[in-house]
Amino acid sequence: MEPTAPTGQARAAATKLSEAVGAALQEPQRQRRLVLVIVCVALLLDNMLYMVIVPIVPDYIAHMRGGSESPTLISEVWEPTLPPPTLANASAYLANTSASPTAAGSARSILRPRYPTESEDVKIGVLFASKAILQLLVNPLSGPFIDRMSYDVPLLIGLGVMFASTVMFAFAEDYATFFAARSLQGLGSAFADTSGIAMIADKYPEEPERSRALGVALAFISFGSLVAPPFGGILYEFAGKRVPFLVLAAVSLFDALLLLAVAKPFSAAARARANLPVGTPIHRLMLDPYIAVVAGALTTCNIPLAFLEPTIATWMKHTMAASEWEMGMVWLPAFVPHVLGVYLTVRLAARYPHLQWLYGALGLAVIGVSSCVVPACRSFAPLVVSLCGLCFGIALVDTALLPTLAFLVDVRHVSVYGSVYAIADISYSVAYALGPIVAGHIVHSLGFEQLSLGMGLANLLYAPVLLLLRNVGLLTRSRSERDVLLDEPPQGLYDAVRLREVQGKDGGEPCSPPGPFDGCEDDYNYYSRS
């Protein structure tokens, strides 16, 4: 019986420690910050996994074509391997080019690089697009699921699916497995990305905190896209194919465990929190003209980036005889203006929150001008400046319009954010599903100059459309969520409640001014007008 006393004391001490840690984690402000960290890590992982395969998969598929699991060793003449591309520079591998490295240097042993054939370029393009395609298909279902289940459980599901996808990438040995892993990542992203952004909007209901938190999330997305190709290329070169994926899988598992500790998604309190008001169906949100304008802007602003990624390297080689390091480094400086754009928009939104539409329109104009200038660049430095302008404009649009979506749901619908951010994810996925597959064909049929000018013109023409959002900042939460629920036909005792609500409104309650879509009042009767 003597050993039981120390055991009981240890158990009691562990219980007290667990309770103390749990109480600290449940403190509202601290929990909100931890949730932001968890979501940012999830977004970082998703974008790192999206880009980490850029220097790995094309080379590995070429090795499989050669009939060997590992690159061939040569001892007399060495050929330099491609430097790992940066940010979204998948073009060094996706472009239809048969560039061969130049023999140089002293005699030493090194891995011989292999390059995809033209047919493999098509397979790699489909592989890169498969993630966005599945994400595009799943988001109309994941949004309502998130609205019904709250945000923590779908985020946990997304992290679990991303963990499985990453492990599958690590042990993949053929194209079919790579394709399945990439598609599985799209399934995980449809849950993790949408629920993560929606959770931030829910935890930070007031401005400017909401814009600031979403800006931090966008910075992590950009950083993940930037750091993933060199991270994957270096580890692939020195540690093998599996190591970068296993590292990302470990971080994904840690993030999921941290979410379990902080949010406790399966506890009784979490089940009580899950009793959210019934959200507006996603098809009705899609028909809301304000939300449609924002979704169109998000798609339009991302098309130049998605279409330039797989084509710009070949154009650089043919136009300015760019070296391999220039093609690999061309996107690297763009991270700085992207973060600067996020910071600037957050600061401006804090001071002038009613001008979010103007920041988005300015971003579209900057994207349009930058895209039109790209074909005129004949050297490396001007091209870098143009791409920096492109990413700066994208930061303005994303940082201004993502909080606007949450605000529109607050004032025109029910404050449940899963479906509206599923629409935002659909907007991004449209661009990135088409880019790797369509961009090369457009360049071959029309030319790179026509592609860039067309995308720039589309952004310039769409910028004035955001004028339709100019009155959004003047809308107020003139009706509560309870009032929205009472729009349904009353039953039983609720007749009296509805009667009192109607009588209260006859007293001259202040109303919000109408927007340019006041003709849609009958369909979206969620705010009053004088």
From Swiss-Prot:
Tissues expressing this chain: Expressed in the spinal cord, brain (excluding the cerebellum), brain stem and cholinergic tissues. Not expressed in peripheral tissues such as liver and kidney.
Tree of life domain: Eukaryota
GO molecular function: acetylcholine:proton antiporter activity; monoamine transmembrane transporter activity
Cytoplasmic side: 1-33, 147-152, 204-213, 264-288, 347-356, 410-422, 469-530
Lumenal, vesicle side: 55-125, 174-182, 235-242, 310-325, 378-388, 444-447
Annotated membrane topology: Multi-pass membrane protein
Catalyzed reaction equations: acetylcholine(out) + 2 H(+)(in) = acetylcholine(in) + 2 H(+)(out); choline(in) + 2 H(+)(out) = choline(out) + 2 H(+)(in); serotonin(in) + 2 H(+)(out) = serotonin(out) + 2 H(+)(in)
Region ranges (Mediates interaction with SEC14L1): 471-530
One Pfam family of this chain: MFS_1
Keyword Oxidoreductase attributed: no
Transmembrane in keyword set: yes
Places the protein is found: Cytoplasmic vesicle, Secretory vesicle, Synaptic vesicle membrane
Assigned GO CC terms: cholinergic synapse; cytoplasm; neuron projection; synaptic vesicle membrane; terminal bouton
Phenotype reported upon loss of the gene: Mutant mice die shortly after birth. Embryos at 18.5 dpc. show abnormal neuromuscular junction morphology characterized by increased number of motor neuron and presynaptic nerve termini and muscle fiber necrosis.
Oligomer and partners: Interacts with SEC14L1.
Record protein name field: Vesicular acetylcholine transporter
Lineage: Eukaryota, Metazoa, Chordata, Craniata, Vertebrata
Gene: Slc18a3
